[in-house]
Design a protein with these regions (language model features):
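A charged, aromatic-enriched C-terminal amphipathic alpha-helix characteristic of glycosyltransferases
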Residues: 342-366
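Short hydrophobic beta-strand element within catalytic cores of glycosyltransferases
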Residues: 303-306
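Carbohydrate-associated surface elements
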Residues: 49, 160, 182
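Conserved donor-binding/catalytic core segment of Leloir-type glycosyltransferases
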Residues: 194-221, 234
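Nucleotide-sugar donor phosphate/pyrophosphate-binding loop at the beta->alpha transition
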Residues: 118-120, 128-150, 185
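Aromatic "clamp/platform" in nucleotide-sugar-dependent glycosyltransferases that forms part
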Residues: 286
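Nucleotide-activated donor-binding/catalytic signature segment of Leloir-type glycosyltransferases, i.e.
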Residues: 246-265
Length: 366
């Protein structure tokens, strides 16, 4: 990624959300954008301001960030017509659309096609808490298919995505490039085993949305406490479902055993320290590909319990995690958690991709 080779390449990355908001897509875009920029590629991140008040333009870690207003404010299904103008009036060599789940993606692809700018799309497959939107995924894919078929490249972060989207969109698998998420946490000292012995910490990591399944971990905790009375749960994330999670913990009489809060987006050292202090990471989302949290848990050698469907199940099939049905009863989830605490899965050595690998693969695709 030398500057001489890539000085002329101007990449516009379009994403519905970006820092200071926290989430898997936001983290992915930040990690690859900063690495591409440090190698000489001119990277601009175009995103939306869903609440108002964020700078319209700023520079973060050598990457120019541009924000356009979202309407209506505060809604996940917002429109952002300003995306069209930025694409139409810029001098971009390629437009990279990150995530296809909002109205931002078709706007960006349509605008790029109108200007005859090559565009690629990374799906970042995931679920949604809104039942109507979840049921409308099939219609969404049908409507987006012509735009996706015209893309210069389609990027999946997991084999699961290639199989699913190829089938649903009737696009040959050869059109997809597999570029997994990276994992790169700083090395931190292991937690004090003597101090924490008998006080197991269960971590559930991800944006606070219903489909992420944090409520399943909270519901299982009373049953875990029957066998491990000092167990605690850390729900690591932020989002609109926080109040409901707190109310559930209070209703079950375990509020003092449940911590809910995110680590600051840029503080990877603190994230590593909190994860290392955990005894098991539990990800019971309705739908995921390969979430960064899962890869980070694997990289730290932590026991990992995942939902058996979607890309999480793929991790279990590879021997990197144990799995359970996302709809299992609270008692069954508790049994699975206790099993991980008592007899954690022993993994074979595995080489995980880094963010440098991810950025280099994207540059090759461009």
């Amino acid at each position: 990624m030398s500057r001489a080779e890539n000085a002329a390449l101007r990449v516009l990355m379009v994403t519905p959300r970006y820092l200071p908001q926290i989430g898997g897509v936001e983290r992915h875009v930040h990690e690859v954008a900063t690495r591409l920029a440090s190698g000489g590629t001119e990277v601009t991140v175009l995103t939306t301001d869903r609440e108002g008040g964020l700078p319209a333009r700023e520079r973060l870690d050598s990457v120019e960030v541009r924000r356009v207003p979202a309407h209506p404010r505060g809604r996940d299904w917002h429109f952002a017509p300003g995306v069209v103008g930025v694409i139409a009036h810029g001098r971009w060599d390629i437009v990279h659309v990150q995530s296809y789940h909002t109205f931002v993606a078709p706007l960006a692809m349509t605008a790029a096609a109108a200007r005859r700018i090559p565009y690629v799309l990374t799906f970042h497959g995931g679920g949604h808490s809104d039942a109507l939107r979840h049921r409308g995924r099939g219609l969404q894919r049908t409507l987006l298919r012509p735009l996706l078929a015209r893309a210069a490249g389609l990027v999946a972060v997991a084999e699961f995505e290639i199989e699913e989207y190829s089938r649903e969109l009737r696009i040959p698998q050869e059109r997809f490039a597999l570029i997994p998420n990276g994992v790169e946490l700083p090395r931190v000292p292991a937690a004090n085993g003597d101090e924490d012995a008998g006080h197991p910490l269960i971590a559930s990591v991800g944006r606070l949305e219903r489909y992420k399944g944090h409520q399943r971990v909270i519901a299982a905790l009373p049953h875990v406490l029957a066998s491990a009375p000092s167990a605690r749960v850390w729900i690591a994330g932020s989002g609109p479902y926080e109040q409901q999670l707190r109310e559930l913990a209070a209703e079950l009489g375990i509020a003092e055993r449940v911590e809910i809060g995110a680590v600051a987006a840029g503080d990877r050292g603190e994230m590593a320290r909190r994860l290392v202090a955990s005894d098991v990471v539990v990800l019971l989302s309705d739908f995921e590909t390969h979430p960064i949290a899962a890869l980070e848990a694997i990289s730290l050698g932590l026991p990992l319990l995942v939902a058996s469907g979607s890309g999480l199940g793929e991790l279990a099939q590879r021997g990197l995690a144990r799995s359970i049905d996302a709809d299992a009863t609270a008692e069954r989830v508790a049994e699975a958690i206790l099993h991980e605490l008592r007899d954690p899965l022993v993994r074979s050595p595995v080489v995980l991709p880094t963010w440098d690998d991810c950025a280099a693969a994207l540059l090759d695709l461009y």
